[in-house]
Amino acid sequence: MKYKLLLWGVGAKYNALLNRIDELVNDNQIEIVGITGNSGIPQSSYLDGYRVVDICDISYLKFDYIVILNDTHFTEILCQICQMLGDTSKVLSYRVFELPGLIFEEYVELKESNLTIISNNCWAGTAYNCLGLECLSPIKNLFITDVDYLKLLHDLKGYFSKELRYKSNAIDPHSGKQYPVMTLGDIEVNCNHALNYEEAIKQWNRRCKKVNYNNLFIEMYTEDKAIEIEFSELEYEKKICFVPYDSDLNSSLKVELYKGQKMFWQAVNSNASRAGLKYDLISLLLKNEIKMRY
């Protein structure tokens, strides 16, 4: 299927991604129906062979998605589109064009599936950010120990229905900053990127409302073989456990540290980011398929 796209924004981001956009057009994955924006738009009918459209006329265009090619003013543009069209469900981030080996149809399928990613640290949030997708998970900017995380996974709905409570403060050994340690029933949730416990509770409650229990992807990393085995026995359709050693379990994948990395979690998280190299993130999340890049 060829998707009709309206590009919103010109400038540095547009110039940086133009060759990638042209490649997808030539590959018949997308069709650019127009380029628009608030500023910097040339007084010309076409730019790089694509039609220039006035913002006032976009409601008359037929398109599948609007792609915002602006990082600095992304939120403001999103609000503007919502005011104009009454909806932002058909808005994509420019980050879609930064994904290596992109199959646009698979990206759209992943977006429309409203996937909730559950992880034991920042991997979920990193993956959403890399893909330019809305975070539909409370597990963002925090970490949970292996044992407590397995408890959570054995009764996800039950734990997510509990109240997140403040327990104490701790010091992040990497940043030296203080952060709130929370409890969710009998498990601890370390909100190591939250400014205070009030913010942690607010963000947790807001994101818990977005969880899609009908489409879950469960991620974990561990250096403990017994934990890995217990994770493999969990009855989730889509799941992956990253380990630093060879494993014959279908739900596990060995990840090595890159040069300059000292902690295993650094290697795990970096592969879910825009710097990731080891596997295809979309194939993993959409089809539970480990598609190696090397």
Predicted region positions:
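Extracellular glycan-modifying ectodomains
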Residues: 89-294
